[in-house]
Amino acid sequence: MLHIYNTLSRTKETFKPVHAGEVRIYVCGMTVYDYCHLGHARMLVAFDVVQRWLRASGYAVNYVRNITDIDDKIIRRAVQTGRRMHEVTDYFIAAMHADERALAVERPDHEPRATAYVGEMIDIIGRLEKNGLAYQADDGDVNYAVRGFQGYGKLSGKSLDDLRAGERVAVGSSKRDPLDFVLWKSAKEEEPPETKWDSPYGFGRPGWHIECSAMSKSLLGLPLDIHGGGPDLKFPHHENEIAQTEGAFGGTLANIWMHCGPLMVDAEKMSKSLGNFRTIRQTIAQGEAQDGEADYQANPREAEMLRFFIVRNHYRSPQNYTPDNLVDAQNALDRLYQALANVTPDVAGIDWNEAQAQAFKAAMNDDFNSSGAVAALFELAGQVNRERDSRAAGQLKALGAVLGLLQQDPAVYFQSSTRYSSAGMQQGASQMDAARIEALIAERGQAKLSRDFARADAIRAELRAAGIELDDKPGGMTQWRRA
C-alpha cells in the first residue's frame, strides 16, 4: 500500500485516488527564459520517478507538467536579445527537452503552454470577481482579494497576520491590501504587441499564479490526486493556486501536495550572484555545449550519473551538490554497472517475491523512498558479485529500469570517459581505497545521527557491493574489512 507525505496535512497518508486505478498528477514546470539548472534537474527527475513507480504499480497515470511561456522574465529576455517572445520560448523549450532526454526523463502525458489557456484564465478571473474575490484596480490590474478567502495559508502554514507584518504597499500601488496578488496585468504601451491579450478588463496578460489554476482544471478536472513542484513554490505560488481554484469553483484543488527538497551548491543556495549557478548541460555535455544551440550531445555515463545522484537521495531531503559528491555518485553507479558487466542478466522480468524486490517495493511505497530502493539495488549487486547469479543480475537491471537506471550496455557504458571518476580508480569493485571507505563510513555515521536511516542503509549496501563488510561497535565506532 502506497503512503505519500502530504505537505497540506504535514503527515504521511495512505494514497487513495479519486477514481480507483487512475492517478491525475499536475506538476508546475519551467518558466522558459533560460537553460535548466541543477535544481530543475532534481524536480524533473523526482517527479519522473514518482510517475514511473505509479505506472509500475498498475495505475493508469495522467501526468501533466506545464510550461510557463508568458512572464516578465521572458519578455525582458526577448527585448534584450531582439527576438520575438515565441522565439525565446521555443528555443528554451527545445533546450529543456534536450536536458530531459539526457536524463532519461519521460515526457509527461500533457505539456500545456500557458499562452494556449488565456481564455480559461479570463473565465476563472470572472468567476472570482463574481464571488467577491477579485477586483480591478485603478491602474487596470485585476487583483485577488486575499482576505476574502477563508483558509489562505493552510498549505504553507502562514497566518494572514504574519504575512501582513512582512508586507509593504509599493509606492503607486492600487492594491486594496498589500497581501493581494495580481490575476491580470494591464498592458503597458512599451510592451511588445504579442504580450497583450484582449479581455473584459482591457488588454493585458495573465499573472503567473492564474496560469496553473486554468491548466490543471482544464486538463485534469477537480480535485487532482497529486499536485507537485519545487520547494520554492509552496508559497506563494501554490498557496495562491489554492485560493484561485477553490475560490472560483469551491471544493478542493488537490488531495495530496508534494514538494521536493532544495538542491544546494556547497551548502549554499544556487544563484548567479554567488557564482555557483550551474546548468544541466554544463554538467553532462560531451565537450562544451554551445550557447545558441538548443540540442547537444550528452555524455551518457555522466548523464546517468547525474540522474543517479538525484535518485539515491529521498526526494524531500535537502541535497548538496559538490564535485566530490558527483565523483562519489559516479563511482557508485560504476559499481552497479560492473556487476552487470560481470554476469549476463537473466531478462525474465521482476520477481516481486524475491527478497530485494520486496525491499525495493516497500521503500518505494513508503513515500517514494528511492534511497531505500537504491539500497536494494546494491544488495543485488553484492549478490551478483559473490555468486555470479544471472537471475540476481536480471533483477538488478529490471528494478533499475523502474528508477530509470542501468539500461545501458555495460560495455558501452564503460567506453565513455567521465570527468567525475576518482583518479586512478579501478573498475573492479574490490579496488575501493581505504580513504574512500572511511569517508563513506563517516557519511553513514552522520546519516544515522540525522535519523536518515535509509541513506545509512544505502551506504552499507553500497560498501557491501564493493566487497566491504562493516562491524558496528559500542560507542558509535565502525570497523570494516574486505570480504
Curated annotation (Swiss-Prot):
What is the UniProt remark on how the cofactor binds and its stoichiometry? Binds 1 zinc ion per subunit.
Q: Which cofactor does it need?
A: Zn(2+)
Entry EC no(s): 6.1.1.16
InterPro entries recorded? Cys-tRNA-ligase, Cys-tRNA-synt_Ia_DALR, Cys-tRNA/MSH_ligase, Rossmann-like_a/b/a_fold, tRNA-synt_1_cat_dom, tRNAsynth_Ia_anticodon-bd
A Pfam match: tRNA-synt_1e
Q: Which residues bind Zn(2+)?
A: 28, 212, 237, 241
Q: Where is this motif: 'KMSKS' region?
A: 269-273
Q: Does the keyword Protein biosynthesis apply?
A: yes
**Gene Ontology cellular-component terms listed:** cytosol
Q: Where is the protein situated, by its record's location annotation?
A: Cytoplasm
Reactions this protein catalyses: tRNA(Cys) + L-cysteine + ATP = L-cysteinyl-tRNA(Cys) + AMP + diphosphate
Protein's UniProt keywords contain Nucleotide-binding? yes
TM ranges are none
> Where's the motif 'HIGH' region?
30-40
Sorted alphabetically, which keywords does the UniProt record give? Aminoacyl-tRNA synthetase, ATP-binding, Cytoplasm, Ligase, Metal-binding, Nucleotide-binding, Protein biosynthesis, Zinc
Q: Where does ATP bind?
A: 272
Task: List the Gene Ontology MF annotations in alphabetical order.
Answer: ATP binding; cysteine-tRNA ligase activity; zinc ion binding
**What is the protein's major site of localization?**
cytoplasm
User: Which terms under GO biological process does the entry name?
Assistant: cysteinyl-tRNA aminoacylation
What is annotated about its quaternary structure and interactions?
A: Monomer.
So what family is this one in? Belongs to the class-I aminoacyl-tRNA synthetase family.
Q: Write the protein's name.
A: Cysteine--tRNA ligase
